[in-house]
Amino acid sequence: MKNYKAIVESLIQFHAEEEWFEFKENWFEQHAIGEYISAISNAAALRGKECGYFIWGVDDEKHEIVGTTVDYQKDYKKEPYQHYLARMISPDLYFSFHEIEISGKRVVVLDIPAAKRVPTSFDGIRYVRIGSSKENVARYPEREAQLFNVLIHGLPTLDTVEAEYQDLSFVRLFTYYAGRGITLRQENFEKNLGLRTKEGKYNILAQLLSDDCHMPIRVSIFRGETKASPLYSVREFGNTCLLLALDKILEYGDVINLIQTDERNRIMERKEVALFNQDAYREAVINAFVHNKWIDGNAPMITVFSNRIEILSRGTLAPEQTLEGFFLGESVPVNQKLSDLFLQLHISERSGRGVPKITEVYGRDVFEFRENSIVATLPFSIVGNITVD
């Protein structure tokens, strides 16, 4: 039996609803609920989730438990409602309603299994979530093709997606490994690192590790607190072997992390204060690389403002990753192959300390989970006035 109380408490921690779950207080349109079941079932499949959820009793803006009075057992057109839903949904889907109590308030959870093999339809129409809305997937051919591809072949990964570029070289990869005391052998390194698809083509992982990954990775510095401020500089670290790019970005953290002299309340000696916590920066950057959705062709983005650094990775948490588990350090990497490489090269240790190191310094609010990205924001500790010249 699922712990629906824990599920709800986990989902309300998200800053915004995602395509595989929906919050409402008392809204209940019986036919439209069937459309939502189709949409959420298909969205859950696209996200690699086992189930999606429609939850009543939660404010959909503030994500606060408010309780609900919905009656999901009343008949629809003289037919038992759940029988009506089951009759209209195809293929057969074992959805279920559950009543729970949280903080003394009634909450109703509709558990919706993800689509398997073929998309879930309601009344002959296949729906999908686009943002917070539900749409007929036939109106979006690319999304429909993606849904069928996921249902047939599974979620795309770094090692299953063919690279756009096939003329790849790996001189820098060999040098990097040698610098870590590991010898790669020309005759078997591609197989050992898993750099080709089943069809024998170079995959995205190979492209990332090649001498030119064809992905720009930039650190942008603005003079003010927003991107509307004057742009001070842009440093380019991409378009090389990803491992080298990561090292350079971590080293650049030392350059921008100004050490300030704090003479306030000075008695015996000056106090040196770093602009931000270097360990937290390192962990946030590595975390962004491991969880970034590289298969879409987009790299993480690091932006420095006058009062903070924002480290953005594309995509969302891994399907098996819960929000609470993420904060506890029970990490499920989005890119398992890349995570394995980082472990082998001692870039990360997979001990579960990365995220807790960040939250210990800055708290959980340092992370923002957006619809298609995760942002870690490290605020600056500023002594006096600092300006970028």
Predicted regions and their residues:
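Structural motif
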Residues: 102-103, 305, 370
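Polybasic/polar functional segments that serve as interface/processing modules
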Residues: 1-95, 99-108, 116-118, 275
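Short, low-complexity, charged/polar intrinsically disordered tails
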Residues: 2, 369, 377-389
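A short beta-strand->alpha-helix segment at the C-terminal rim
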Residues: 357-363, 367
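Interdomain "switch/hinge" adjacent to the Bergerat
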Residues: 92-96, 100-159
